């Protein structure tokens, strides 16, 4: 109970900073146990902490792939719900891949991670439908952990 009770306070420490994140917004994050390893990702409403999507675990992934997929899924979710929100992510690599509209992973394709590569191909195709998007870096130093963080560090 104590862990649960203290989480919302810790997650929302950014409310009291001089330059808090923009609201409303969507925060995305990924978790990967090892590299490669089991990968999952999710998106949450930054303000409320409500989880709006979650996927995985998928075997044989990397954190950057998860972040890339989470951003694209977030863009799709915002478009489907006709919302013009900022997306916060904490992976510079994934954001660069989004801007290039290409997941530039060096991960070798294997039988165990074939599903991930199917998701990557679908995400890259989906990116062709987005003319503009607002993705910003989550400022962990100023705001604490991203609200979508899985808390496994």
Located regions from the model:
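Short, charged/polar low-complexity linear motifs in solvent-exposed/disordered segments
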Residues: 52, 70-72, 113-114
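Short glycine- and acidic-rich boundary segments immediately preceding or forming the N-terminal edge
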Residues: 1-18
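Short, charged, low-complexity patches
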Residues: 63-68, 116
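A broad, low-specificity signal for short, low-complexity segments enriched in glycine/proline
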Residues: 3-6, 47-48, 96
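RNase H catalytic domain
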Residues: 32-35, 75-151
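Short amphipathic alpha-helical surface micro-motifs
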Residues: 7-10, 23-26, 115-120
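RNase H-like nuclease fold core
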Residues: 13-65, 76-77
